[in-house]
Amino acid sequence: MGVSLLWALLQDMVLAAIPALGFAMVFNVPVRALRYCALLGAIGHGSRMLMIHFGMNIELASLVASIMIGINWSRWLLAHPKVFTVAAVIPMFPGISAYTAMISVVEISHLGYSEALMSTMVTNFLKASFIVGALSIGLSLPGLWLYRKRPGV
């Protein structure tokens, strides 16, 4: 890994920790857990960035990163997993894709139908939907696998 990739990774992780910390405060996370929410947000977003850099598509990278966020942190700190995971996953939500899809909807209603606008809208809407679905599945899988009270069979 080059120096520029490491710098970009560090920058991405710091900038992802800030909204994770902010949303953790909005969700009234205990003060002792705030640093872990920021750390998880940074780890999740940084790992997703590395996976995308090395050729994985954003949907699958979001799934793997959200699974990584959901594993084992609550057992170490004796807290419910959602205390850490929800605030840490929020920086990975697809704001640009959702915004572009909504702008395309507004332009279609204002300017009328065009194939380019419709293609942009559908592409960005599906991309945002699949990323949100991957994040929600990735958050729920560790809870189903690791924190299950009854046996699976």
Curated annotation (Swiss-Prot):
Show the InterPro entries listed in the entry.
Answer: ThrE_2 (IPR024528), ThrE_Dicarb/AminoAcid_Exp (IPR050539), YjjB (IPR020914)
Q: Membrane-spanning residues where?
A: 7-27, 51-71, 83-103, 125-145
Keyword match Transmembrane helix: yes
Decide whether keyword Heme is in the record.
no
Q: Name one GO cellular component term.
A: plasma membrane
GO BP annotations listed: succinate transport
- Supply the alphabetized keyword list: Cell inner membrane, Cell membrane, Membrane, Transmembrane, Transmembrane helix, Transport
Topology relative to the lipid bilayer, per the entry, is: Multi-pass membrane protein
Give the superkingdom in one word: Bacteria
How is this protein organized at the quaternary level?
The transporter is composed of YjjB and YjjP.
Instruction: Give the protein's function.
Output: Involved in succinate export with YjjP. Both proteins are required for export.
Query: What family is reported?
Result: Belongs to the ThrE exporter (TC 2.A.79) family.
This protein is called what?
A: Probable succinate transporter subunit YjjB
**Source organism of the structure:** Yersinia pestis
Q: What is the lineage of its organism?
A: Bacteria, Pseudomonadati, Pseudomonadota, Gammaproteobacteria, Enterobacterales
